[in-house]
């Protein structure tokens, strides 16, 4: 039995969840998210202020996995429209700077030109102290992808530790050549 999948998702007071066939729409104070679940192995229903995800066939192993996945995605949608999500990144290196230009993010990370990252719909960048970047949004997956895109501009290198890293991320350091 899927332990996560059998738990109901509680719907807070200010959040409205509606299910039409395979389309789940979650509206809340921060915005609206819609996701399509094309899996015929699970059903989604709203009952008594809770979202229930049920399997169509109890013996199916794939259905157990999809039940847990679907429940987790719906829980993230509810969390996103109530509180939102954020990922923090920090820049380590001499002369590494970040600036906000309108909605977009401009990074100076040792290249001959500044790198501009355009904010997608639903994503907001904040810059603190020129070297800390905060990526905010209501869609957990989209926030994670944008943070990964920012990090990919200059990944942390193992010799000096320079680059863009997630806050609290530990970079394994290597010894340089001796001799």
Curated annotation (Swiss-Prot):
The keyword Metal-binding does not apply. Keywords: Ribonucleoprotein, Ribosomal protein, RNA-binding, rRNA-binding. Disulfide bonds: none annotated. It comes from the Bacteria. GO terms for biological process: cytoplasmic translation. One of its GO terms (molecular function) is structural constituent of ribosome. GO terms for cellular component: cytosolic large ribosomal subunit. It holds the Pfam family Ribosomal_L6. The keyword Repeat does not apply. Gene3D superfamilies: Ribosomal protein L6, alpha-beta domain. Belongs to the universal ribosomal protein uL6 family. Part of the 50S ribosomal subunit. This protein binds to the 23S rRNA, and is important in its secondary structure. It is located near the subunit interface in the base of the L7/L12 stalk, and near the tRNA binding site of the peptidyltransferase center. This is Large ribosomal subunit protein uL6.
């Amino acid at each position: 039995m899927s332990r996560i999948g059998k738990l109901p998702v509680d719907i807070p007071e200010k959040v409205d969840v509606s299910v039409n066939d395979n389309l789940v729409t979650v509206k809340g104070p921060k915005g609206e998210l819609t996701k399509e679940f094309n899996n015929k192995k699970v059903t989604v229903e709203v009952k008594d202020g809770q979202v229930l995800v049920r399997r169509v066939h109890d013996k199916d192993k794939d259905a157990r996995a999809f039940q847990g996945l679907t429940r987790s995605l719906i829980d993230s949608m509810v969390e996103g429209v109530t509180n939102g999500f954020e990922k923090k990144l920090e820049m380590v290196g001499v002369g590494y700077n970040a600036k906000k230009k309108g909605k977009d993010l401009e990074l100076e990370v040792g290249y001959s030109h500044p790198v501009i990252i355009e904010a997608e719909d639903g994503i907001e960048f904040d810059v603190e102290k020129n070297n800390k970047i905060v990526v905010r949004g209501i869609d957990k997956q989209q926030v994670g992808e944008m943070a990964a895109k920012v990090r990919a501009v200059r990944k942390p290198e193992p010799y000096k530790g320079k680059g863009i890293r997630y806050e609290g991320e530990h970079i394994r350091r290597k010894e340089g050549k001796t001799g």
